[in-house]
Amino acid sequence: MSSPRVVSLGGGHGLAAMLQALRVVTPHLTAIVTVADNGGSSGRLREEFHSLPPGDLRMALAALCGDDDWGRSWAEIMQYRFTSSGELNGHALGNLLLTALWDRDGDPVQGLDRVGALLKVVGRVLPMALQPLDIEATFRNWEGVHVIRGQKEVAAGKGRLEDLRLIPEDARPTPEGLSAIAEADWITLGPGSWFSSVLPHLLVAEQREALYNVKGKILIALNLDAVATKSGDELA
């Protein structure tokens, strides 16, 4: 019996945990990662280079690194974060490497594939879209209605979510991601911050249509526990 083809949608630590589990089951893995991060090292590089935020993509690559000394060593190097009193403070080395490749070649998918080959990753890592996105949400609480913009801000939003949208709204997925979804035996959504890492995948029109028409099965992985600062985690 051949190994199943699995596409995993999400972002951040939740997606990384899912990938670490799935890689034991199948080598035919495609991770499709949110590209709306606006905080920390990713946010700084995104603003300076007008590039995709690399952090969640870096974490997915590290989670799928080759299971040998070479792969594990490079995964640790990719996750290495500088501590200094200068401009490098807080930057992860993997973020800088991905941004350098994108800046040089202008091709996010090629850059991810190059780093994937370096790390001997199991499967493939793709961005949810080829341009950096912003997440905007409308929450209602006892103080009234509030519009919040930004991935880290939406993740910590309080109250009942009334609307969630991407900016720009016409974001286009990668052809490679759409093909992987169409051919998948299984698609996973979650775990993670639902409002900022998982549900945005359903706001990309072409990707949502591909998921609606998929022949494989869809698995939704809820969070084991809620995080007090993450409103979207209350779904668990």
Predicted features by range, described:
Residues 34-159, 165:
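Electropositive, gly/pro-rich neighborhoods at or near active sites that engage anionic ligands
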Residues 201-208, 234-236:
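Charged helix-capping and loop-helix junction motifs
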Residues 40-43, 229-236:
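Short, glycine-/small-residue-rich phosphate/pyrophosphate-handling segment
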Residues 194-204, 229-230:
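Glycine/threonine-rich flexible loop motifs
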Residues 1-55:
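Gly/lys/ser-thr-rich phosphate-binding loops in alpha/beta enzymes
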Residues 163-178, 203:
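Active-site glycine-rich loop that binds ribose-phosphate moieties when present
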Residues 184:
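An anion/phosphate-binding loop that grips the pyrophosphate of nucleotide cofactors and donors
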Residues 26-27, 213-218:
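A short helix->loop->beta-strand "cap" motif at the edges of active sites that frequently abuts
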